[in-house]
Amino acid sequence: MADKLTRIAIVNHDKCKPKKCRQECKKSCPVVRMGKLCIEVTPQSKIAWISETLCIGCGICIKKCPFGALSIVNLPSNLEKETTHRYCANAFKLHRLPIPRPGEVLGLVGTNGIGKSTALKILAGKQKPNLGKYDDPPDWQEILTYFRGSELQNYFTKILEDDLKAIIKPQYVDQIPKAAKGTVGSILDRKDETKTQAIVCQQLDLTHLKERNVEDLSGGELQRFACAVVCIQKADIFMFDEPSSYLDVKQRLKAAITIRSLINPDRYIIVVEHDLSVLDYLSDFICCLYGVPSAYGVVTMPFSVREGINIFLDGYVPTENLRFRDASLVFKVAETANEEEVKKMCMYKYPGMKKKMGEFELAIVAGEFTDSEIMVMLGENGTGKTTFIRMLAGRLKPDEGGEVPVLNVSYKPQKISPKSTGSVRQLLHEKIRDAYTHPQFVTDVMKPLQIENIIDQEVQTLSGGELQRVALALCLGKPADVYLIDEPSAYLDSEQRLMAARVVKRFILHAKKTAFVVEHDFIMATYLADRVIVFDGVPSKNTVANSPQTLLAGMNKFLSQLEITFRRDPNNYRPRINKLNSIKDVEQKKSGNYFFLDD
């Protein structure tokens, strides 16, 4: 019985429908044929049940199931013990827990569906860990005995005795208006227990929003409001689930500084974040999570910030001698053509233009772009990046200035609201029939974005990240001269972001087209950009879109507005933010090098 639990069977509750099939899984299972009850299911049962002790991992039932509801995952051999929580039979399980330390910020990094939010719930005391015994959950005494000798024992004892108060900033801020009613100011006044409301509001730019109703706030405003509500309450454990989605680069750093200002020798702070440069800036130490999404997740020991993120990118945990991803993710900045060479390939020009919308005025400096090139637009929210994209697409007419060249345009908007009823396959078939079966497109776009896994689901039931990937595939599948992509990384986890960036880059090179991308995730922006367009001015009053610059010049200009400096990690070249007023930071500001390309 040495290998009694070396695999784990997952039955998808949504897809398994015993009433509609002939129980192929049970009929084809060799163990059942030998007369053992490995798979139990009848046409009357709600869902199939698979015994993990009897299963031999042959994988026949997976292939036979007409709905694709089963998956059987072989576990690394050291995962029989240390189960922290399992939801029910044949469902997700989490191994170990991240270890928070008082007075420091713990960052969690890992893909979606790998148990970060479960870990947060358990550490907040909102979910009682059942140590894998889902049929008879243990009581707290047993749980404490189980964790004895680790820092978690003290932590859980404190939660039980001292009633440590935990607050979680939820992941999906767009759901907040359904729960919270009233103006921003009134809610903040109600929650303000530490009397720091004025300072926090100033840091997060919320002072001018106090009269607004919560349901009228945009995504970024809701995010800042949610962070503020958490920061002004009295608590011992602060948890932030993705505090940077919807925010632009400047606001991300402000949010990070606000979260770091909560540090106190007897407070625990835990952050889940997919933007690696923000995570780097925020955390004092990091736990990685690896495993198979929605099957099992494993938490590593805490590492230092740099080491933790590099381990996540390398896909290899040295302390456990375990590889959890085939390829490591490396950031080589693209070799950009010299300024002289670019001139020869010049294809398209756009004129200087002006556009006034209500109070807001945008001036665009004339520029030109070539094919096989990705332009990244850098600027805060409300500096007219989306307006510029819509003018290029011909959706908005300029008030003064020349005509925009008529181009075929494919546009992926920032907010994706699915209107279509039906499955993803039908949608792809309607919109991009030629592309989605084309072998080149399948290898370049469909496979890396993992559209296959969700192709038969209803479009209305997809999660944010799944919708984002479908939208990206639809956008790239439409034949066009120029692809306009607005925030391709929203809702995606760190690994999918890098995949998406790679997809866009490879597709643009192969198809010899141009792409304009709006992106706030710094790592993604540097990875994508051949040239950058910097937007400056006063947000939502009057702003200027400069003509395209090289990556180095543009980044220096943009970062000098934000007053941040970057260095490069020597191992995998990812950009890292320098801590404010550190030696490096002061040096680079003096010499005016805000951004480095050299290796």
From Swiss-Prot:
Look up the EC number in the record and give it: 3.6.5.-
Stretches assigned to coiled coil: none
The reaction(s) catalysed by this protein are: GTP + H2O = GDP + phosphate + H(+); ATP + H2O = ADP + phosphate + H(+); CTP + H2O = CDP + phosphate + H(+); UTP + H2O = UDP + phosphate + H(+)
- List the Pfam families hit by this protein, alphabetically: ABC_tran (PF00005), Fer4 (PF00037), Fer4_RLI (PF04068)
Q: Which residues form the ABC transporter domain?
A: 79-315, 342-562
Q: Which domain of life is it from?
A: Eukaryota
Mutation: residue 489 to C; reported impact is: Confirmed at protein level
* GO MF annotations in UniProt: 4 iron, 4 sulfur cluster binding; ATP binding; ATP hydrolysis activity; CTPase activity; endoribonuclease inhibitor activity; GTPase activity; iron ion binding; ribonucleoside triphosphate phosphatase activity
In this protein, which residues make up the domain named 4Fe-4S ferredoxin-type?
7-37, 46-75
| Phosphothreonine PTM positions | 550
Q: Name one GO cellular component term.
A: membrane
Where along the chain is ATP 1 bound? 110-117
Q: Name one GO biological process term.
A: negative regulation of endoribonuclease activity
What the entry lists under PANTHER family is as follows: ATP-BINDING TRANSPORT PROTEIN-RELATED
Look up the further comments and give them: The ABC transporter domains seem not to be functional.
Name of the protein in question? ATP-binding cassette sub-family E member 1
